[in-house]
């Protein structure tokens, strides 16, 4: 399985705080400053007219950032488009770090907060990462390891959101809260 075409979506903690028009000037400012590490920021596209669509898209050479409205759950989504020379765990870690950097900037610039206890990981390549048990089994070990690295040892429960092979492989990541007595 090729892991470079993966994405992560952090859901907005308060969906009503997401006003799509506010993100256009923010993303243009990011392009002017080129402030996302390891990304050549290129353009902004407004898809706010599309119901439950990609919202506002920030295009970079290496991946796309979007204020996504999919499934009626607003959030920040980052899709990596280009491969790296990194191991699968390191590559996934880099994807999370890129999305986390963008989320921190948005929390500062747009005053929107993101839920880091529940999010999804999407394989954006049906050919090389089909939505089946084998691909999910191959993705789980590096994904779990990357999550532990990025979220400082936290455990996450990973489940497929759909068994429909026509859908992209989407993994729900839910932070496991330890019960201390």
Question: What function would you assign to each model-found segment?
Answer:
Residues 13-25, 86-90, 130-135, 179-180:
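Short, conserved charged micro-motifs
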Residues 159-181:
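C-terminal edge-of-domain segments
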Residues 11-66:
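N-terminal low-complexity, intrinsically disordered segments
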Residues 61-90:
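Intrinsically disordered, low-complexity regulatory segments enriched in Ser/Thr/Pro
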Residues 1, 58-59, 65-72, 111-115, ...:
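Short glycine/proline-enriched loop/turn "hinge" motifs that connect secondary-structure elements
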Residues 126-154:
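Short, hydrophobic/π-rich interface segment
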Residues 5-6, 114-133:
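Short glycine-rich, basic-tinged beta-strand/loop micro-motifs
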Residues 22-30, 84-109:
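Ampiphathic alpha-helical segments that act as solvent-exposed interaction surfaces
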């Amino acid at each position: 399985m090729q892991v470079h075409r993966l994405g992560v979506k952090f859901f907005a903690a308060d969906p009503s705080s997401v006003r799509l028009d506010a993100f256009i000037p923010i993303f243009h400012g990011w392009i002017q400053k080129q402030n996302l590490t390891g990304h050549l920021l290129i353009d902004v596209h407004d898809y706010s007219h599309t119901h439950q669509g990609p919202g506002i898209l920030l295009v970079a050479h290496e991946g796309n950032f979007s204020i996504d409205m999919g499934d009626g759950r607003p959030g920040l989504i980052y899709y990596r488009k280009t491969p790296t020379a990194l191991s699968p765990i390191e590559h996934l870690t880099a994807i999370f770090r890129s999305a986390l950097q963008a989320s921190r900037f948005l929390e500062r610039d747009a005053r929107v907060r993101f839920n880091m206890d529940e999010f999804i990981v999407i394989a954006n390549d049906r050919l090389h990462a089909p939505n089946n048990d084998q691909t999910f089994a191959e993705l789980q070990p590096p994904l779990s390891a990357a999550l532990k690295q990025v979220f400082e040892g936290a455990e996450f429960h990973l489940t497929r959101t759909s068994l429909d092979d026509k859908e992209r492989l989407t993994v729900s990541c839910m932070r496991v809260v330890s019960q201390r007595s």
